[in-house]
Amino acid sequence: MLTIYNTLSKTKETFKPLDGNNVRMYVCGMTVYDYCHLGHGRSMVAFDLITRWLRKSGYALTYVRNITDIDDKIINRANENGESFDALTARMIDAMHEDERRLSILKPDLEPRATDHIPGMHAMIQTLIDKGYAYAPGNGDVYYRVGKFAGYGKLSRKKIEDLRIGARIEVGESKQDPLDFVLWKGAKPGEPFWDSPWGPGRPGWHIECSVMSTCCLGESFDIHGGGSDLEFPHHENEIAQSEAATGKPYANAWMHCGMIRINGEKMSKSLNNFFTIRDVLDKYHPEVVRYLLVASHYRSAINYSEDSLRDSKGALERFYHALRGLPRVAAKGGEAFVERFTVAMNDDFGTPEACAVLFDLVREINRLRESDVEAAAGLAGRLRELGDVLGVLQLDADEFLRAGAEGKVDAAQVEALIQARLQARADKNWAESDRIRDQITAMGVVLEDGKGGTTWRLAD
């Protein structure tokens, strides 16, 4: 039985879909003004893991993750670059998809873009105005009336009276209350705009997600997710808009993933510790990065450091060494490991405990590989099967263990030396065999002799 920590109730709850076996999940995606950073990667991988386990558990999942393709940051960056906002967003969307491909992230079922849902935003805003939850001061802007919504703060546990302390209305704003937030922004000179009943302008950030989620999944759906930094004000405002407009509960469960810390500090451009996904993947194997992101519980903060990456690489090497040299066959045996893995994942997607099961499975494979190759191979298939839930262990073992060899050693030369060494051993020329092995070792290559022959990998 699957339990999920619901940020709304601040407790773990038994997961009960609203519609039988069908599950509808919406996750806040990228604002595409720049390359994805590690924090985005954290959210991408976390909800990819959740997607994989829901489907593995037999649920019929519809996974929606939006793209915010109009925003102040996008407009500012496009102006800095001297390009149109849509040219910038198209380029960044392509880059995002490439990052996801390298991290083995499955595509969402739907990936709505804000600019494709402008009419729906007009309709929801008008509904809010008609119900008294929003107002148009006459300058092209439309604001949400926060004080009108009785449930404001129920997600973040923030109180309106506390929020009002220090809140103020900025110059140029026409709010009735400092806490009110914008639903529609009147057009400014030189900015992209769309016609609306309140004049030309563009949507506010929060209304975009309310409209895209309900358009794709209905007025009420099962799971709404995102990074913990979105809990307030973004997700709080989504609830206020959506429930005021529809009169129905918005999302049944709210899930938030933890943030990335760099060497124990918050990731920040000002601290010069800001990394894009592509920067990291150019330096480290994508599976090493993915395992780092998935091995910690999705709600926990992750510390990104050389040490943590080294630990991630070491863990994967242990897994792949267990797979190496065994025939690739269907999973067989190991039902007790599957049961433990299932218990861990059903407890709010408990990946630390699930990964511990994989290490125990590796020990059993290694115990059997010399005495019962068939049983070891079946368990190796099981290791790959469970690894697939985490999005890892699908590569050829030698391919992973040799990763990074390109540009460091000549693979053809290594293979030729291995053949020469094999011939020397066949000729019982042990001195020549040892000399060749020493030559290969000096190249930074480790040889491993086994029943299936000699394989090699780069030294750590």
Swiss-Prot record:
Monomer. It is an enzyme of class 6 (ligase). The lineage of its organism: Bacteria, Pseudomonadati, Pseudomonadota, Gammaproteobacteria, Pseudomonadales. It comes from Pseudomonas entomophila (strain L48). ATP binds at K269. It catalyses: tRNA(Cys) + L-cysteine + ATP = L-cysteinyl-tRNA(Cys) + AMP + diphosphate. Its cofactor is Zn(2+). Belongs to the class-I aminoacyl-tRNA synthetase family. Signal peptide: none annotated. SMART domains: DALR_2. Zn(2+) binds at C28, C209, H234, E238. This is Cysteine--tRNA ligase.
